[in-house]
Amino acid sequence: LRGGSRLSRKHIMQAADDSLKRLQTDYIDLYQLHWPERITNTFGNRSFQYAQDSWEDNFMQVLEKLDKIIKSGKIRHIGLSNENPWGIMKFVEYSKNGLPKMITIQNPYSLLNRLFEVGSTEICKYENVGLLAYSPLAFGVLTGKYFNNKIPKNSRLDLFPTLKRYNS
């Protein structure tokens, strides 16, 4: 996307402008960063593995760019998605220097997936970051869609079999 997945100032501005064009609007109420730039343990990968990838500790730069976009009137509030407790706290820490605060996080949360409660709940409670539950019906598992372990063709668990463990 946009010549790379970096959360650079250029890419953030381009992504915001592209979103405004696609939505055919003048401003966005809530703009969320969909993925952390660094490699994290998400979607079934529960153990942290240090990876010397090329991400930069650019939390401050990201917030500075988002601050400019907010001040320009293009977005009103910012949030996170697929972030872990360490990443949430880094953004909270930097926002205390007069930069905008991440007001939401959209992470998986359901009766079958309660990993958010380990670390993130406490941070979000005390730092006033709201949870927008992703996949509250566990990709349909809680609806009875997969009754008797039958997986319908082209369903999420058929298309992404590695997610079976993640939701049960």
Could you say what each language-model-derived stretch is?
Residues 11-31, 96:
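CE4/NodB-like, metal-dependent polysaccharide N-deacetylase domain
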Residues 4, 20, 112:
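Glycine-/small-residue-rich active-site loops that bind phosphorylated ligands and cofactors
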